[in-house]
């Protein structure tokens, strides 16, 4: 018996069984097995423990012996050709004959053994884990967008939502294919055949079942404020517009969460939450709705302190491609049960399913808040100031940058109530207690001055705060206002590690200036993110493409990422 078994038995104050060589050993073992397996002693814990340990050790010993025998067999199989001449059982010699002298193995045996060894060492033992199927060889999705198929589907949609909620008007189809700032509007052949307006999750499910059965592609649509072509169709099919699904389903104030439908705008949601001293932090562009915000995993000016959309979604109700309805999880904040399906759907842009309901986290509004604006002599100085604020751990709520061209566009558009210094400008937002906000403002003022700040203004009232922050929210629309008829707007979204932010902003600004295109830089630089906005004519299309291509390359070289609608 092994030492472990003996030690275990001693711990139980039982005498170990006799060795297996003892004549009494089989009888004792059988007696003990019968004793502890009987109903009379079924509850005897010590007996069950002895039996369990003994059986386990016997199984382990048998496994080790079997493994050892298997290893010996493999070794003999591999080396048989080399050791064949040294058999441990040579044929006995005749008494009258002298013992034969040892001789070298035959050449054929040596040759065969060498070939076996060579093949055994060169042949891979495990399959190559890498994919051997090139992307070009994969089978693309096959859709049926012929006239007969789409017209038959139209009749099915009318049965589901009513004829008034299925539109084939050309203007409506165009609006669901492109936007004023889309750099790649859909070709007429790629526009949706119709736009369907469901009102419930069940209707969305029925619509998707029809499309799945008829192999019709689908694009979801909510606010239509995307800047990088997220809702632009490429295969025709249909567009599902969630305009009728715009209700706040339930507010759980005590739990700090709210259940909403996809066409609820973040601005209208915050108006409702403000009545309860609550707010929903993600704040992308004006007009954005929850469905699109989930689909794109949006950011916003509050992302520096509060994070992006990913941090504020608890659960989703999703309709899959075949019409199956799933709920990704329940409402509790903490859950480690199963896969994190919620995060999987956030940022998937409708490619995995259509969101018909979202449970969002909300938080209590800060007791105090303020806004400050600092201007600088160069874009590099402004970016360096941001890096210092972040590096020093100043707990500001938001950090936004607008370059000199963007400030000039805002003045020209007259979208705000004041004239701004046309210089690279940083907009800071502060929140917390009154004392905390005051301390943050003082720290940022000092850092701005140390990094070449030309001016520093901060809001002393709610009206001043609204006025100062209005310039940031009007950035895109101000640029749209300066473009001439026939010109287009192209936007790009770049993010890099914070340590590379000053470099990429400076190099991008220099490149934009040298291109001669009307352009600006604006963004949520607190987390290393900024946008470029290009205005170009049809003649300048190639020039704009080259500029965007260099920006993409620059971001990748700096270990960053880019979201841009870019086709070569």
Predicted regions and their residues:
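Short acidic/histidine-rich active-site segments
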Residues: 524, 560-568
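C-terminal substrate-recognition/cap domain of FAD-linked oxidoreductases
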Residues: 98-102, 170-177, 364, 370, ...
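FAD-binding subdomain of flavoenzyme oxidoreductases
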Residues: 247-254, 258-400
């Amino acid at each position: 018996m092994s030492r472990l078994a003996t030690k275990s038995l001693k711990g139980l104050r039982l005498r170990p069984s006799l060795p297996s060589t003892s004549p009494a050993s089989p009888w004792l073992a059988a007696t003990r097995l019968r004793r502890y397996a009987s109903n009379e002693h079924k509850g005897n814990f010590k007996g069950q423990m002895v039996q369990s340990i003994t059986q386990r050790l016997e199984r382990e010993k048998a496994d080790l012996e079997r493994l050892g025998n298997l290893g010996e067999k493999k070794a003999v199989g591999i080396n048989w050709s080399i050791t064949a001449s040294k058999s441990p059982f040579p044929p006995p010699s005749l008494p009258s004959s002298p013992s034969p002298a040892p001789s070298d193995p035959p050449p054929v045996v040596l040759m065969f053994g060498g070939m076996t060894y060579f093949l055994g060492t060169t042949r891979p033992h495990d399959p190559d884990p890498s994919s051997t199927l090139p992307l070009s060889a994969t089978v693309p999705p096959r859709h049926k967008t012929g006239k007969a198929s789409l017209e038959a589907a139209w009749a099915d949609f009318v049965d589901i939502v009513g004829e008034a909620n299925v539109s084939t008007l050309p203007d409506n189809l165009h609006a669901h294919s492109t936007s004023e700032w889309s750099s790649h509007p859909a070709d007429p052949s790629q526009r949706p055949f119709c736009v369907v307006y469901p009102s419930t999750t069940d209707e969305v499910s029925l619509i998707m079942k029809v499309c799945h059965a008829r192999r019709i592609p689908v694009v979801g649509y909510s606010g239509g404020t995307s800047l990088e072509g997220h809702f632009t169709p490429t295969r025709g099919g249909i567009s599902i517009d969630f305009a009728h699904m715009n209700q706040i389903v339930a507010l759980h104030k005590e739990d700090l969460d709210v259940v909403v439908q996809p066409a609820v705008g973040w601005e209208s949601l915050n108006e409702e939450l403000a009545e309860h001293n609550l707010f929903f932090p993600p704040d992308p562009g004006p007009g954005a709705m929850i469905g699109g915000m989930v689909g794109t995993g949006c950011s916003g000016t509050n992302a520096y302190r509060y994070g992006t959309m990913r941090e504020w979604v608890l659960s989703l109700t999703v309709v899959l491609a075949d019409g199956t309805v799933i709920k990704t999880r329940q409402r509790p904040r903490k859950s480690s049960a199963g896969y994190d399906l919620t995060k999987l759907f956030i940022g998937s842009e409708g490619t995995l399913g259509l969101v018909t309901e979202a449970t969002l986290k909300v938080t209590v509004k800060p007791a105090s808040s303020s806004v400050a604006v600092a201007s600088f002599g160069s874009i590099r100085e402004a970016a360096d100031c941001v890096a210092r604020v972040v590096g020093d751990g100043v707990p500001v709520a938001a950090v936004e940058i607008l370059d000199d061209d963007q400030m000039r566009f805002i003045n020209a558009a007259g979208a705000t109530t004041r004239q701004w210094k046309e210089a690279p400008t940083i907009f800071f937002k502060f929140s917390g207690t009154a004392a905390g906000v005051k301390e943050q403002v003082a720290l940022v003022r000092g850092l701005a001055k140390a990094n070449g700040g030309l001016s520093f203004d901060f809001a002393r009232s709610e009206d001043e705060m609204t006025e100062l922050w209005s310039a940031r929210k009007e950035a895109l629309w101000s640029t749209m206002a300066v473009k001439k008829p026939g010109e287009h707007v192209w936007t790009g979204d770049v993010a890099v590690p914070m340590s590379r932010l000053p470099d990429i902003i400076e190099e991008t600004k220099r490149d934009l200036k040298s291109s001669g295109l009307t352009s600006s830089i604006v963004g949520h630089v607190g987390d290393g993110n900024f946008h470029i906005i290009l205005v170009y004519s049809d003649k300048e299309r190639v020039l704009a493409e080259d500029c965007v291509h260099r920006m993409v390359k620059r971001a990748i070289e700096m270990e960053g990422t880019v979201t841009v609608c870019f086709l070569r």
